[in-house]
Every structure is written in C-alpha cells, then in structure tokens.
Amino acid sequence: MSEPSSCFVLPDPEWIYRVGIGQDSHRFLPSDNPKPCVLGGIIFENTPGFEANSDGDVVFHAICNAFSSVTHQVILGALADELLKAKGISDSAVYLKEAVASLKPTQKISHLAITIEGQRPKLLPKISAMREKIAEILRISLDSVNITATSGEGLTSMGQGHGVQCFCVLTVMEFCPR
C-alpha cells in the first residue's frame, strides 16, 4: 500500500494553502536587568528584556512555531536549543532563518498576520521597522506582513504589564502537481 499524498488530487497542477498558527509569550525581567527588549528583531529602549534563554523575541518565536505547524520541523525547543548550547547563539533571527529554510522548494510564503498583546512597550512607533525586518528575513514583500497590537485592557497578565504575548497566522502556498 502506498503512502497517501500530502496534496489533494486536482485535475491540473495547482497550489494548495497550508496555514500555520504560532504563539509565544515571555515575562519581563526586573527593570534593573540590562538585557534589551527585542520584538520583531527591533530593540525597544526603556523596556526590560524577557525571561528567556534566548533574546526572548516573542514575535520571532511565534513565527517559528507557525513554521513548525506547516513544516513539521521543530525549531524552538530543538534546533534553537542546539544552537544556543553548542554555539551560544541567542539571536532569535537566526532561529527564524532556520525556520524559513525548513520550507520545501515547492512551498512559498503568501502572508503573515501577527497580533501582539502587552501593556508595554508602545509598539506603534516601531511597527513599520518590525514589518520591514520580518519581510527581509522571510524574503517576502512588505505588504505580505501585517502587525496589529493590543494593550489587553488589563484583562490578562500581559495586559497588566507582566510580559508580552504574540499570536500569528502564516499562510504558505504549496505547488502540488497532479
């Protein structure tokens, strides 16, 4: 018995869509800790960094998790831990580049939607820079990366200022010939 195809049987060669969902959250370090706050590859001054072995970039981590749900390749908790332990690499941009490399040659990123929850830092002044950095790493157009932000209105620990949480939805097109 042959293994079932991961592609739908279509009358002509077609693209199918795969959707990955990612989430990550980290608590802030005490304000006297010198570790910088990094979100979407951008440093936010006057905000403490995150409790994490890496730089704690919850945006890049959520995107990595979304890639994992599309490619079935575990980036965080496996590859990232190996890079950190073996080479001392704590830059989440490196982990995200590995996630991008996990795509098959037949797969192409179509769109990335990100929502970030936290009372601080104020994201609006740096959302454009975050979008540019993400688009650069993912090698997609700027209009394919969208970021929204919410304070959480104090309803969650993130909205109360204890940390930052990020959710994202990654849409990947895959060419599946008949």
Swiss-Prot record:
NCBIfam families: ispF. Binds 1 divalent metal cation per subunit. The keyword Lyase applies. A divalent metal cation binds at D24, H26, H61. Its EC number is 4.6.1.12. This is 2-C-methyl-D-erythritol 2,4-cyclodiphosphate synthase. Its cofactor is a divalent metal cation. 4-CDP-2-C-methyl-D-erythritol 2-phosphate binds at D24, S25, H26, T150, S151, G152, E153. Transmembrane segments: none annotated. Involved in the biosynthesis of isopentenyl diphosphate (IPP) and dimethylallyl diphosphate (DMAPP), two major building blocks of isoprenoid compounds. Catalyzes the conversion of 4-diphosphocytidyl-2-C-methyl-D-erythritol 2-phosphate (CDP-ME2P) to 2-C-methyl-D-erythritol 2,4-cyclodiphosphate (ME-CPP) with a corresponding release of cytidine 5-monophosphate (CMP). The record marks N53, S151 as: Transition state stabilizer. GO terms for molecular function: 2-C-methyl-D-erythritol 2,4-cyclodiphosphate synthase activity; metal ion binding. GO terms for biological process: isopentenyl diphosphate biosynthetic process, methylerythritol 4-phosphate pathway; terpenoid biosynthetic process. The keyword tRNA processing does not apply. PANTHER family: 2-C-METHYL-D-ERYTHRITOL 2,4-CYCLODIPHOSPHATE SYNTHASE, CHLOROPLASTIC (PTHR43181:SF1). Belongs to the IspF family. It holds the Pfam family YgbB. Keywords: Isoprene biosynthesis, Lyase, Metal-binding. Pathway: Isoprenoid biosynthesis; isopentenyl diphosphate biosynthesis via DXP pathway; isopentenyl diphosphate from 1-deoxy-D-xylulose 5-phosphate: step 4/6. Homotrimer. It catalyses: 4-CDP-2-C-methyl-D-erythritol 2-phosphate = 2-C-methyl-D-erythritol 2,4-cyclic diphosphate + CMP.
